């Protein structure tokens, strides 16, 4: 049952998919955290895998950069492969002084400067929020594992190299915890097609101080975020 962007057969994906932006991070997650892993798709080198975590079938697949890219993959996974839950596991930038590099953020909502959701929602503002039960499970997973995690709003930007640097002051005033490029789109796609979604991000760089992690570190570490995501799936299963 291939789509234009996914060449996996029917039934290849689990009902829960972790989605990093980087397909190599998807490969890392599959090889490091999952057992009995099988690669199920590789169109455009956007790798997807299915395996098990503590006996629970889970998939992981990259979604690329930006709302247009992640929206394509999220939509096809939900409508063509029956995926019920998507957990974005990605990086973000910080603007607040009290948010530090490598902090983990659970995105309960996502503001955006993108017009994608206005197009989808007939020129009205859509409140892009995570699924409550998934958010609660992630918070519980973080506490059980002793991992400090913040919960709050993300900002999904259309431009990585923004000309409007003063907007960072506004974000800080409004308490934005992290700036990334996808969560608002994934939340809206999930809402449109009756699925559930959550974004968990690790701060990879601080926009104010200039402190940053390397591309290799972003690809091969950030294990706390991944652990929270995987453990939250198990907690969610018990709650259902």
Curated annotation (Swiss-Prot):
Leader sequence segment: none
Binding site for a purine D-ribonucleoside: 5, 180-182, 204-205
GO BP terms: purine nucleoside catabolic process
Catalytic activity, reaction form: a purine D-ribonucleoside + phosphate = a purine nucleobase + alpha-D-ribose 1-phosphate; a purine 2'-deoxy-D-ribonucleoside + phosphate = a purine nucleobase + 2-deoxy-alpha-D-ribose 1-phosphate
Marked site: Important for catalytic activity: 218
GO cellular component: cytosol
Amino acids binding phosphate: 21, 25, 44, 88-91
Gene3D superfamilies: Nucleoside phosphorylase domain
EC number in record: 2.4.2.1
GO molecular function terms attached to this record: purine-nucleoside phosphorylase activity
The keyword Transferase appears for this protein: yes
Source organism, top-level taxon: Bacteria
Xref: InterPro entries: DeoD-type, Nucleoside_phosphorylase_CS, Nucleoside_phosphorylase_d, Nucleoside_phosphorylase_sf
Active-site residues, as the UniProt record annotates them: 205 (proton donor)
Keywords, alphabetical: Glycosyltransferase, Transferase
Subunit organization: Homohexamer; trimer of homodimers.
Function of the protein: Catalyzes the reversible phosphorolytic breakdown of the N-glycosidic bond in the beta-(deoxy)ribonucleoside molecules, with the formation of the corresponding free purine bases and pentose-1-phosphate.
HAMAP family (UniProt xref): Pur_nucleosid_phosp
Record-linked PANTHER family: PURINE NUCLEOSIDE PHOSPHORYLASE DEOD-TYPE (PTHR43691:SF2), URIDINE PHOSPHORYLASE (PTHR43691)
Family of the protein in this entry: Belongs to the PNP/UDP phosphorylase family.
NCBIfam families in UniProt: deoD, PRK05819.1, PRK13374.1
The protein's name in its UniProt record: Purine nucleoside phosphorylase DeoD-type
Species in which this protein is naturally found: Actinobacillus pleuropneumoniae serotype 3 (strain JL03)
Gene: deoD
């Amino acid at each position: 049952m291939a789509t234009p962007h996914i060449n996996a057969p029917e039934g290849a994906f689990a009902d829960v998919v972790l989605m990093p932006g980087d397909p190599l991070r998807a490969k890392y997650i599959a090889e490091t955290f999952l057992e009995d892993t099988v690669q199920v798709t590789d169109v455009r080198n956007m790798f997807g895998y299915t395996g098990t975590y503590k006996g629970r079938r889970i998939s992981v697949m990259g979604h690329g950069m930006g709302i247009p890219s992640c929206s394509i993959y999220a939509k096809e996974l939900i409508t063509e492969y029956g995926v019920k839950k998507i957990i974005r596991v990605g990086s973000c930038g910080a603007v607040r002084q009290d948010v530090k590099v490598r902090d983990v953020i659970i995105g309960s909502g996502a503001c955006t400067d993108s017009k994608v959701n206005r197009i989808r929602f007939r020129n009205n503002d859509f409140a892009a929020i995570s699924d409550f039960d998934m958010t609660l499970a992630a918070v519980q997973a973080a506490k059980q594992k002793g991992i400090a995690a913040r919960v709050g709003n993300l900002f999904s930007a259309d431009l990585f190299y923004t000309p409007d640097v003063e907007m960072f002051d506004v974000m800080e005033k409004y308490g934005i915890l992290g700036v990334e490029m996808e969560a608002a789109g994934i939340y809206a796609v999930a809402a449109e097609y009756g699925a559930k979604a959550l974004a968990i991000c690790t701060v990879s760089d601080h926009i104010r101080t200039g402190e940053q992690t390397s591309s290799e570190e972003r690809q091969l570490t950030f294990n706390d975020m991944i652990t929270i995501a995987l453990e939250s799936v198990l907690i969610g299963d018990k709650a259902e």
